[in-house]
A protein has these predicted regions:
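Long, contiguous binding/interaction regions
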Residues: 151, 177-178, 182-189, 193-204
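Structured core elements
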Residues: 2, 9-11, 31-33, 84-86, ...
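Long, charge-patterned amphipathic alpha-helical coiled-coil/hairpin "stalk" segments used as oligomerization
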Residues: 96-116, 122-166
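Conserved small/polar residues in nucleotide/adenosyl-binding loops
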Residues: 210-215
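Long, low-complexity N-terminal extensions
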Residues: 80-85, 109, 115-118, 122-123, ...
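Glycine-rich anion/phosphate-binding loop at the beta-strand->alpha-helix junction
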Residues: 9, 15, 79-116
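Glycine-rich, flexible beta-strand/loop modules in the N-terminal catalytic cores of phosphate-handling
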Residues: 2-78, 166-190
């Protein structure tokens, strides 16, 4: 997925196992992993595997992606399977977590469609279309899809995750040494509601481009 100069490689794999707390429950699970390639930023970032541990930021983003995309799936119908979403940032220019959710949903939908074809299933496993976008206040003005310079200087920073029925899944808003009003939140919502249908349409197109059997396993 590409949002300006932010590029994230997303893929989804379905495994025949679940975490211990779900064994013999009949329910499935979805989890996500996120990472930034060393050359994804202007200055090289060390691989977290080389450091021996994940940063708090990485863990937070992984949890956000997982929480968001679990809302897309009926885990009861999935059965005792685990869906693993991998999001690897190739180029980072702000909004990598929201881009990961956008691309992660497309990869998830394609993996589920491939799984249903393989086992001739008709169950509605995907129940919500999920997308995300960043908004913020930059120099006193509400802006959407912030790039890195905008994000790093924003007075207010916000990440929004929504389903295609207009309901919110996540609304993370933080003042960066600044307070913000209810009106600011309403401005954010107005911006997001204008853009989300465009993102959803792009997701639909991305899914339709890979409907043939030959392309089912190609990452988005």
């Amino acid at each position: 997925v590409k949002l300006g100069n932010t590029h994230v490689l997303c893929s989804a794999v379905i495994e025949d196992r679940v975490p211990g707390f779900l064994r013999n429950s009949g329910k499935g699970w979805l989890t996500a992993e996120y990472g930034m390639l060393p050359s994804s930023t202007n200055e090289r970032v060390d691989r977290e595997a080389a450091r021996g541990k994940q940063s708090g930021r990485t863990q937070e983003i992984q949890r956000l992606i997982g929480r968001s995309l679990r809302c897309a799936v009926n885990l009861d119908i999935l059965g005792e399977k685990t869906i693993k979403i991998d999001c690897d940032v190739i180029s980072a220019d702000g909004g990598t977590r929201t881009a990961s959710i956008i691309g992660g949903y497309v990869s998830l939908a394609r993996a589920i469609n491939s799984y249903k074809k393989k086992y001739n299933l008709n169950n509605q496993i995907i129940v919500n279309q999920i997308a995300a976008i960043s908004v913020g206040v930059v120099k006193g003005t509400a802006c959407i899809d912030l790039d890195y310079p905008e994000d790093s200087s924003a007075e207010v920073d916000c990440n929004v995750v929504m389903s295609n029925d207009g309901q919110f899944i996540e609304f993370q808003s933080t003042g960066e040494e600044a307070k913000f009003t209810k009106q600011t939140i309403l401005e954010f919502i107005e911006l997001v509601e204008k853009v989300m249908p465009i993102i959803n349409k792009a997701q639909d197109i991305a899914c339709l481009l890979y409907t043939s059997d030959a392309a089912d396993d190609t990452p988005c």
